[in-house]
């Protein structure tokens, strides 16, 4: 059974808004710096999920743009994750405290030095380089990235 989710990177032109996941117990992302996002709710489109999750986790009203889709086979036991990757450059509002971790604007040149999933380095670079729409698969064994496949669409 697949799990559908979104991950959103909010870009202010010189920094990405990152979430340091350090507040939720038993969090598969504990200690990592990631974008904001979450699981799709029943009947929700990926776009609706991205807008909702951004508002819930950051307090920002945003216009997310879908940049790609990543499959994570068996990312959690017996569950494949299909994650819609969004980039946001249009947003308004003030940041709120997030119950999942600490939000921080991270300069582009520091983003890849933060502790994160190994594969995140790859697709965050694609977002920063404004690569075309992508479909990718990242295969992990625990924290170790075993394989990456990607197709870009012009």
From Swiss-Prot:
GO biological process: DNA repair; DNA replication
Required cofactor names: Mg(2+)
Protein origin, superkingdom: Bacteria
Keywords of the record: DNA damage, DNA repair, DNA replication, Hydrolase, Magnesium, Metal-binding, Mutator protein
Residues that, per the record, bind Mg(2+): 38, 53, 56-57
Enzyme class, first EC level, given as a word: hydrolase
Catalysed reaction equations from the record: 8-oxo-dGTP + H2O = 8-oxo-dGMP + diphosphate + H(+)
Positions of the Nudix hydrolase domain: 1-129
One Pfam family matching this protein: NUDIX
InterPro entries: Mutator_MutX_prot, Nudix_hydrolase, NUDIX_hydrolase-like_dom_sf, NUDIX_hydrolase_CS, NUDIX_hydrolase_dom
GO MF, one annotated term: metal ion binding
PANTHER family per UniProt: 7,8-DIHYDRO-8-OXOGUANINE TRIPHOSPHATASE (PTHR43758), OXIDIZED PURINE NUCLEOSIDE TRIPHOSPHATE HYDROLASE (PTHR43758:SF2)
Family the UniProt entry places it in: Belongs to the Nudix hydrolase family.
Function of the molecule: Involved in the DNA repair system to avoid A.T to G.C transversions. Degrades 8-oxo-dGTP to the monophosphate, but is also active on all of the nucleoside triphosphates.
UniProt-recorded name of the protein: 8-oxo-dGTP diphosphatase
The species this protein was found in: Streptococcus pneumoniae (strain ATCC BAA-255 / R6)
Gene name linked to the record: mutX
């Amino acid at each position: 059974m697949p799990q559908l989710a979104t991950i959103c990177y909010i870009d202010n032109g010189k920094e990405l808004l990152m979430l340091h996941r350090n507040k939720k117990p038993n969090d598969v992302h504990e200690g990592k710096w990631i974008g904001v996002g979450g699981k799709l709710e029943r009947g929700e489109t990926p776009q609706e999920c991205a807008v909702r999750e951004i508002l819930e986790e950051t307090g920002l009203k945003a216009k997310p743009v879908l940049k790609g889709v990543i499959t994570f086979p068996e990312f959690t036991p017996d569950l494949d994750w299909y994650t819609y990757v969004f980039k946001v450059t249009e947003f308004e509002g003030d940041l709120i405290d997030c119950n999942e971790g600490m939000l921080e604007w991270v300069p582009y040149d520091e983003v890849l030095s933060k502790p994160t999933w190994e594969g995140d380095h790859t697709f965050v670079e694609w977002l920063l380089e404004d690569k075309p729409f992508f479909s990718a698969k990242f295969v992990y064994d625990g924290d170790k990235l075993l394989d990456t496949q990607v197709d870009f669409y012009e």
